[in-house]
C-alpha cells in the first residue's frame, strides 16, 4: 500500500497537446460495432502487464485460458522475457512462443505503463514494441494484431516517472505504428479518460496508487472491447492440441538490450512493483514471483 503523502501530481499537463486525430486513422482505429459478445472475448488472447494480469487473477473478465499478464513487464521485454508456463513443459516460454502454441484468432496487447520514463522517447518505445509484436506475428502469422492504448493514470499517482503527458505521447505514436504496420489500434483510453481533465475517470484507478484499473474501469474496458470488435475470416491452419496456460512469471526488474537512437537505455522503474513481493533469480537478470491458477 502506498502512503497518500507519497502520491505525486503532474504540473503543466495539457490534455489537448497529444490528441489523436481519429479522422486521420480511420482504417486503423477500431470503430464502434455491434456487441460481439463473450464469444469474442473467449477467442481473443490478452497479453500485457499487471492490468492484464488483474483481468483474470483478481477479476473474472478472462481466465488463464485466454490471458497472459506479467506484473512489471514492459513492451521492450515482449520478444525475450520467458514468463509463460504451459502444460506441455515445465520451462517458461516467451509470450510469442505461447501465442504459437495457444493459436488464438487475435491478440490484444496492452503494454507501455512500465516503459514510461522521462528519458525514454516515444520513437524508441514504439521501435522496441514493434520489434516485440513482430516476434508474435513471426511465431503465428495467422493471428490478428490489436494494440490497445496505454490506460490513463490518475491525477495523483505513486510513481514520479509517470506522466499523463507521456502516456498521451506514447499512445499517439502507437496509432502511427499500427497504421504503418497494418495492425489495428483499440483506442480504449477514450472510455477510461475524464474528458474534462484528460486523466483517468474518478473511480477507475486504485486510490492507493493511481495506476491500476479498478473493477469499474474493467467493466467499461470490456464493454468497449466487445463494442469495438475486429472479426476477420478465420484463416488459421487446422488447430493442433492446445496446451493449458498454467503459470506466469512476474517481472520486477528485467534488463534487455534496447533498440535506441535518441534515448537513454536506462530501464524504467516498474510502476507495478508495489504489487509484488521481491524475490531474486539468477536467470536472465530477472527478479520474479510465480503465479498459478487457483485449483478448482
What annotation goes with each model-predicted range?
Residues 2-38:
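Non-catalytic propeptide/linker segments at domain boundaries
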Residues 34-127:
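Conserved SGNH/GDSL esterase-like catalytic core that processes O-acyl groups on lipids
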Residues 110-114, 136-168, 190:
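Active-site segments of SGNH/GDSL-like serine hydrolases
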Residues 1, 29, 34-39, 54, ...:
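Extracellular glycan-modifying ectodomains
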Residues 122-132, 167-170:
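Charged helix-capping and loop-helix junction motifs
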Residues 153-259:
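Catalytic His-Asp segment of secreted/periplasmic serine-dependent ester chemistry enzymes
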Residues 1, 7-14, 219-296:
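Conserved catalytic region of serine esterases and O-acyltransferases that act on ester linkages
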Residues 40-43, 103-107, 140-145, 181-184:
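Loop/turn elements at helix/coil->beta-strand transitions in domains of secreted/extracellular proteins
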Amino acid at each position: 500500500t502506498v502512503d497518500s503523502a507519497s502520491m505525486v501530481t503532474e504540473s503543466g499537463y495539457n490534455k489537448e497537446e497529444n490528441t489523436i486525430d481519429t479522422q486521420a486513422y480511420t482504417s486503423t482505429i477500431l470503430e464502434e460495432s455491434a456487441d460481439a459478445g463473450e464469444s469474442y472475448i473467449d477467442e481473443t488472447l490478452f497479453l500485457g502487464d499487471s492490468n492484464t494480469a488483474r483481468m483474470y487473477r483478481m477479476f473474472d473478465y478472462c481466465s488463464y485460458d485466454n490471458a497472459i499478464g506479467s506484473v512489471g513487464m514492459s513492451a521492450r521485454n515482449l520478444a525475450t522475457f520467458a514468463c509463460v508456463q504451459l502444460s506441455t513443459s515445465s520451462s517458461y516460454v516467451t509470450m510469442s512462443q505461447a501465442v504459437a502454441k495457444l493459436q488464438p484468432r487475435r491478440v490484444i496487447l496492452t503494454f507501455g505503463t512500465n516503459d514510461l520514463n522521462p528519458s525514454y522517447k516515444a520513437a524508441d518505445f514504439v521501435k522496441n514494441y514493434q520489434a516485440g509484436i513482430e516476434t508474435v506475428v513471426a511465431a503465428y502469422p495467422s493471428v490478428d494484431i490489436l494494440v490497445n492504448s496505454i490506460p490513463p493514470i490518475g491525477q495523483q499517482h505513486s510513481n514520479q516517472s509517470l506522466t499523463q503527458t507521456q502516456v498521451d505521447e506514447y499512445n499517439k505514436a502507437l496509432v502511427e505504428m499500427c497504421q504503418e504496420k497494418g495492425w489495428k489500434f483499440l483506442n480504449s483510453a477514450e472510455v477510461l479518460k475524464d474528458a474534462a481533465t484528460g486523466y483517468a475517470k474518478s473511480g477507475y484507478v486504485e486510490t492507493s496508487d493511481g495506476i491500476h484499473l479498478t473493477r469499474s474501469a474493467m467493466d467499461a474496458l470490456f464493454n468497449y472491447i466487445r463494442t469495438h470488435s475486429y472479426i476477420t475470416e478465420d484463416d488459421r491452419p487446422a488447430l493442433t492440441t492446445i496446451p493449458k496456460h498454467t503459470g506466469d512469471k512476474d517481472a520486477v526488474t528485467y534488463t534487455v538490450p534496447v533498440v535506441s537512437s535518441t534515448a537513454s537505455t536506462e530501464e524504467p522503474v516498474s510502476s507495478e512493483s508495489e504489487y509484488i513481493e521481491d524475490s531474486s533469480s539468477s536467470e536472465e537478470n530477472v527478479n520474479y514471483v510465480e503465479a498459478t491458477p487457483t485449483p478448482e
